[in-house]
Design a protein with these regions (language model features):
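Hydrophobic, glycine- and aromatic-enriched re-entrant/interface helices and adjoining loop segments
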Residues: 1-84, 103-111
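Hydrophobic alpha-helical segments of integral membrane proteins
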Residues: 5, 86, 118, 158-163, ...
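Transmembrane helix-bundle signature of multi-pass membrane transporters/permeases
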Residues: 60, 72-75, 115-119, 147-150
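Lipid-exposed faces of alpha-helical membrane segments in multi-pass integral membrane proteins
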Residues: 80-94, 113, 117, 121-124, ...
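Membrane-proximal intracellular helices of multi-pass ion channels
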Residues: 83-86, 94-108, 113, 173-176
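Structural signal for the C-terminal ends of transmembrane alpha-helices
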Residues: 90-101, 161-169
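Loop-to-helix entry and N-terminal half of a specific, functionally important transmembrane alpha helix
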Residues: 99-138, 144
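A juxtamembrane structural motif centered on a specific transmembrane helix
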Residues: 124-176
Length: 176
């Protein structure tokens, strides 16, 4: 109670209230989250088809090219498309863990684990945000959201991981 009244500013309290119940302000701060969940739900199992989603085409889903790309994906490709994206990120993380295990040094291993953690944090926060399990943030979905700086950083990070793979293969070849 004390932290709520004195530790948080008004806009921070409003964000927490809207995270817990976005219907308190459906045309204001809760609009993004409500439209996002409606978009994902309207996709059903197989979706409406690429570029065929009504909420997406009519731009009811705000920021659908950046923060809410998963909502647009859910509407147009449905549960199956969302599941494939999540499985793709899980496969990427599994591969990064394998790369970390095979790295030449602890430093390289920790770099790869850090990059994997960074990417998975972004994925989890973005997906949780779009399905209503987390507060609305500005974190993009790696490799899918429009955002040049985030995309460049993510590709540089994967480039570092590929360098670790190359170095570990080179040292393995020298051992043979």
């Amino acid at each position: 109670p004390w932290l709520w009244m004195h530790g948080l500013k008004d806009y921070q309290r409003d964000r927490l209230v809207l995270f817990l119940d976005p219907s308190k302000d459906p045309l204001g701060g809760g609009y993004h989250l409500l439209q996002s969940t409606v978009g994902i739900g309207s996709g059903g199992v197989l979706g409406t088809g690429l570029l065929q989603g009504q909420l997406t085409k009519l731009r009811f889903i705000p920021e659908q090219h950046t923060d809410f790309i998963f909502s647009a994906l859910g509407e147009e490709t449905g549960f199956v498309g969302c599941l494939l994206v999540v499985l793709g990120f899980a496969a990427l993380m599994a591969r990064l863990l394998q790369v970390a295990r095979n790295a030449r040094s602890d430093f390289e291993s920790l770099v790869v684990i850090g990059i994997g953690t960074m990417l998975m944090f972004q994925v989890v926060v973005n997906i949780f945000m779009t399905i209503g399990l987390g507060p609305v943030t500005g974190i993009p979905l790696p490799f899918l959201s429009y955002g040049r700086s985030a995309m460049v950083v993510n590709f540089i990070a994967l480039g570092l991981c590929l360098s670790v793979v190359r170095q570990s293969r080179r040292s393995l070849a020298q051992l043979r």
